[in-house]
Amino acid sequence: MSSAVASKGMNQGSEFDDNKDMCPICKTDRYLSPDVRFLVNPECYHKICESCVDRIFSLGPAPCPYKSCDKILRKNKFKTQIFDDVGVEKEVDIRKRVFNVFNKTLEDFDNDLEAYNKYLEEVEDIVYKLDNKIDVVETEEKLRTYEELNKQLIMNNMERSKKDLENFEQRQQFEKEMRMKKRMLERQIESEDKMNKEWAKREIVNRLASSTNADDVIEGVKNTVKLKKSSARRKLEEINRVLQNNPYSSLMLSQGLSRKEDNVPFTPFNGDRDLDKRYTIDQESYDDPFIKDLENRKDYIASGFRSDFVYDRMLTEAFMGLGCVVAEEV
């Protein structure tokens, strides 16, 4: 039985070809042909080089050249393999196809997180069945029926996703340009500061030659340097204000505020963010001989041991959550 399993494993390995750099059809490899490109077809995901695809499928649909495969393939369906693992490649393609149909977002459920999670679980079930070939006919029919019944919703969600992507790209481009201008102004200011420092040194020496009051000379040179500063600093301040008040960020914020408040699941750890402690540590009125003894041991001192840390942790654990009313949080 073990030999049969081994034989089966060898057949599967030869089917998908363990040699990633050689075409299993024409035996062309990257060592002799560095520019060779390998393609796969979503029908069966068998790896074939580009030359074999052109030679076999140029005249129209043809059977897969792999002996164990009976799929009919078309040339326009071949694509470059992105992932080394064919299983991952197949799952990613299935997810793309399913998510193009089941493309609802949390907004479509009025921010009802529970309903949205059930929807996502249903989508994951479809992906799992298609990926593992479980009830493929029924699952494909379900996918097709949903697409026919929700064409308008699918198109609207695609348009919304497209607009969100465009806004994101515009924001990225805007911030990139602002940062570039900021760097240029910072270099200009740095160069001017260097020149002003050199000028100030020379000017102080020249003025001290005809004046005995060093403080007045230094103060006068400082005031002159302040007046000589160019408009680059004002431009830099303006860019910083623009970056802080990013119009794209404010747009996204306004969209977020217009949505309903999310139903955040209850967490018992809200107390860990309390800034005001509900207790004070009074070590003088509490004597713990065990803890006090540890303060004198070198192996504990070396690790940064402090008795107040111990008391602080114990009191934190005791008082944490006292201000949290579970009935109001759930």
Curated annotation (Swiss-Prot):
InterPro entries hit by this protein: Cdk-activating_kinase_MAT1_cen (IPR015877), MAT1/Tfb3 (IPR004575), Znf_RING (IPR001841), Znf_RING/FYVE/PHD (IPR013083), Znf_RING_CS (IPR017907)
Location in or out of the cell: Nucleus
Gene: TFB3
Gene Ontology CC entries for this record: transcription factor TFIIK complex
UniProt cross-references to Pfam families, sorted A to Z: MAT1, zf-C3HC4_5
Keyword entries, A-Z: Metal-binding, Nucleus, Transcription, Transcription regulation, Zinc, Zinc-finger
Chief subcellular location: nucleus
UniProt cross-references to CDD domains, sorted A to Z: RING-HC_TFB3-like (cd16573)
Origin organism lineage: Eukaryota, Fungi, Dikarya, Ascomycota, Saccharomycotina
Functional summary from the UniProt entry: Acts as a component of the general transcription and DNA repair factor IIH (TFIIH or factor B), which is essential for both basal and activated transcription, and is involved in nucleotide excision repair (NER) of damaged DNA. TFIIH as CTD kinase activity and DNA-dependent ATPase activity, and is essential for polymerase II transcription.
One biological process term in Gene Ontology: transcription initiation at RNA polymerase II promoter
Annotated protein name in UniProt: RNA polymerase II transcription factor B subunit 3
GO molecular function: cyclin-dependent protein serine/threonine kinase activator activity; zinc ion binding
PANTHER family: CDK-ACTIVATING KINASE ASSEMBLY FACTOR MAT1 (PTHR12683:SF13)
KW Zinc (keyword) present: yes
Signal peptide feature range: none
Positions of RING-type zinc fingers: 23-68
Organism: Candida glabrata (strain ATCC 2001 / BCRC 20586 / JCM 3761 / NBRC 0622 / NRRL Y-65 / CBS 138) (Yeast)
